[in-house]
Every structure is written in structure tokens, then in C-alpha cells.
Amino acid sequence: KNSIGIEIQNPGHSYKYSNFSSKQIYSLKKLLKFLLKKYKILHKNVLGHSDIAPERKKDPGEKFPWKNLAKEGLCTWHTLSKQDLKNARKIPIPNKYQNIFLKNLYKIGYNSIRGQSFKINLKKLTMAFQRRYRQELIDGKVDKECLLISKNLSKI
């Protein structure tokens, strides 16, 4: 229905993608607190370009401090510990669980995938999810860790 876009200066993935400065994040937090309160925006509705258009956008990317913002109630983050996820990374899952992963993503606000380019779009959607919720490894593969995180988020 309505949206507010906030651009944060960063060269991006094509031009030496760099960390966001503490000054940028401080200003962003201050602005988000104001906007969320003034417009009664739910923290689950704070999204990045790649969450909305994963087939063509990569920003804000894996160096964006989503977890840090979530600690202040400014966006969502999963509640799983490193211990919960420790042995799940790179563990393949059967295809039927990929559908569960996609349903979980739909529940948390990502668009569903359709059309001839299903495999390509699945990879891009998964990479967008990983850039936000599993920033240490962005490979576009739906593994057990991605499934666990998506399941956890779908229940928040």
C-alpha cells in the first residue's frame, strides 16, 4: 500500500562493497525509531531492497547490521542461537522441504516464485534471504540452516 524508502550511501557489490559506518547506523536507528512510532509501522515491515525485489536487487546486502537493528526492535531477526544452527549449515534438504522453505518465506513477506525461471529465481530469493538472515554464507542453496531460520521467523 504505502512505503518509505531510505537510501544509505555505500558503493555496493559492484564497486568494493564496504561496511556501513557507525555514524550511518546511528542516524538510521534514530530515523527508524521516529518513523516506526509516527506512522505506527510494525518492525516486521522494515525491509531491504533485496527483500522486495530479490531477482534484481542486492542491497543493502550482507554487511548491513540487521541483527543489530533487531536488538533494538527495529526489524525482525530469528531467535535461534549459534548452537541451534551449528550443525545445520550446508546440510542438504530434500526437495519437499524446499517448498516448506518457500512457504515460510512467503509468510514473512517475500514474494512467491512462478514461471519458467524457477531455479534461477529460487537461487536469487535464497541469496536475498541469506544476505539478511545468514550473512556469513551467501550461496543461494537452501540447506537445513536456511530451513530452520525460515521456520523460526515464520512463527514470530
Predicted feature descriptions by range:
Residues 1-8:
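Short coil-to-beta-strand
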Residues 8-16:
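Oxyanion-hole/transition-state-stabilizing segment in secreted/luminal serine hydrolases
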Residues 17-113, 124, 128, 145-148:
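Basic/polar, cationic surfaces and motifs that engage anionic cell-wall
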Residues 55-60, 132-139, 156:
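Secretory-pathway/luminal and periplasmic proteins that interact with or process carbohydrate-rich
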Residues 113-117, 132:
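Flexible, substrate/cofactor-facing loop regions flanked by secondary structure
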Residues 116, 139-140:
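Acidic, glycine-anchored loop motifs typical of Ca2+
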Residues 131, 144-156:
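C-terminal accessory extensions appended to soluble enzyme cores
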